Amino acid sequence: MKPYKDQQIIIDDILNEFAYRNRIMLQLPTGAGKTAVFSFIAKRFIKDYKKKVLVLAHREELVNQTLATLRDIGVSCESIIASKKTLKHNANAYVGMIQTLKNRLRSNPLFVKEIELVICDEAHLDIFKEVFEYFPNAKILAVTATPSSLKKVNFTRCHRCKKEYDTITECCNYETY
């Protein structure tokens, strides 16, 4: 599996932005391959920085989809699920549901060590902001099709988005496959 040409441009742009910014929101339209894009970003981040990545989602099917995509592109990853009480710390990426991670972090703030990039899928949901405090030095990539629930909003001017993120990258003209 390889990214499409347009996806590769986005991947390169986001990784370049991380040299200057810590919190980035990436808006990609539905069908543009958000999971593939952020999975390739995770893979490159792991390779380039030798650091671990955490991917958070709010639904189990998104967790499973992300695990499958990361494994397909050769990333060693492990799920964070309620029934699993310990993690193999040799994985390069961890994927879990936001609520499960929040519960783990409350009881053990060191539950996930060495995380330098946190990726939030469907990041327009407010539940993700609570986790950021556990990773104050990590890069944050928030990926969504709809950064605001308001219709017809210019996302780069959305006050809530600008308050949370250093930059907002819109890919409105992105071709879907």
What are the language-model segments listed below?
Residues 35-40, 45-72:
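Conserved Walker A/P-loop ATP-binding site and its immediately adjacent core
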Residues 23-25, 52-54, 92-93, 117:
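Residue-level preference for the first positions of well-ordered beta-strands
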Residues 98-100, 107-149:
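SF2 helicase catalytic motif II
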Residues 154-177:
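Interdomain hinge/linker at the junction between the two RecA-like core domains of SF2 helicases
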Residues 1-27:
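Conserved pre-motif I regulatory segment
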Residues 12, 64, 103, 129:
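Alpha-helical elements of the RecA-like P-loop NTPase motor core of helicases
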Residues 70-106:
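Inter-Walker segment of RecA-like/P-loop motor cores
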Residues 20-43, 144:
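Walker A/P-loop
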